[in-house]
Amino acid sequence: MATEFFLKLWDNHIIQLGVWQTVYMTFLTSLFAYVIGLPLGVVLWVTDKDGLHPNKGVNTVLGFIVNFFRSIPAVILMVAMIPAAKLLLGTSTGNGAVIVTLIIAAAPYVARMVESSLKEVPAGVIEAAQAMGCTNFQIIWNVLLPEAKPSLISGSIISTVTILSYTALAATLGGTGLGQVAIIYGHQRSQKLVVWVCVLLIVVIVQLIQIVGTTVCLLYTSPSPRD
């Protein structure tokens, strides 16, 4: 009976659509989370006491905002941000609204990941660039970000996997994807096979993200032939 029900879902492309929607929401959210989180992380590093342009006031305010959003459990934050989604999109339902709430939940997390990666760059590298007369922008763009690239890529893997887990939570807010399939067609209908298939598919997606991210990271950390 369970197998027949699962095959019916498969034949109706419900499982396949859930995979696509999960991947779509994960990567679109990751993209915009980094559009917001990357500059925010750079500013946090720059204004830190050991940064290029220390500014305690700016760093304290931004740090408080980031920590405030990071301290709220993801599902509660997503519920709280529904009005913001409605303000931006005119609706509080659907994947568009869910993606907005996901971005707001993920961006502060990304900002801290970026800041942590930038702090791993040796101070001597920055000092050498300053001694050569580079401007702060040149140091950030041509020295800091390239030096931190392997760590940034590693952090992006963790961030993307975390955002993937958020998409499953989004099913409770009306979002689609494998989370919705697991809840509606699995849990609510006592179809454990459907739930476990969704779990396995999410695991596969995570592994693919990890493999791709690790491969890209190795390309930047492996010594060149000239070395």
Positions of predicted regions on the chain:
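Hydrophobic alpha-helical transmembrane segments of polytopic membrane proteins
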Residues: 178-215
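Conserved small/polar residues in nucleotide/adenosyl-binding loops
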Residues: 220-225
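Peri-membrane helix termini and adjoining interfacial loops of integral membrane proteins
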Residues: 2-3, 172-180
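Membrane-water interface segments at the C-terminal ends of transmembrane alpha-helices
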Residues: 16-119, 154-161, 201-209
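Transmembrane alpha-helices
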Residues: 136-166
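Short helix-to-coil transition segments within interhelical loops
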Residues: 118-148, 188
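Hydrophobic alpha-helical elements at and bordering transmembrane segments
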Residues: 15, 19, 23, 65-68, ...
